[in-house]
Amino acid sequence: MARKALIEKWNKTPKYSTRAYTRCRICGRPHAVLKKYGICRICFRELAYKGEIPGCKKASW
């Protein structure tokens, strides 16, 4: 319930632009969000393993 409320609060435009912060579009996690994709590292990893992110593959060297 608290996470849903935070997501709703995040969707509103803030009074001042400095109050805006990134949040994962899938799970709502506020930390470790990749700006390019708009999702957190955990969701990114899951989607990358499933092959749902085009052009992304596991690095190996």
Curated annotation (Swiss-Prot):
Pfam families: Ribosomal_S14. Its cofactor is Zn(2+). Keywords: Metal-binding, Ribonucleoprotein, Ribosomal protein, RNA-binding, rRNA-binding, Zinc. The keyword Transmembrane helix does not apply. Zn(2+) binds at C24, C27, C40, C43. GO terms for cellular component: cytoplasm; small ribosomal subunit. Belongs to the universal ribosomal protein uS14 family. Zinc-binding uS14 subfamily. NCBIfam families: PRK08061.1. This is Small ribosomal subunit protein uS14. It comes from Clostridium botulinum (strain 657 / Type Ba4).
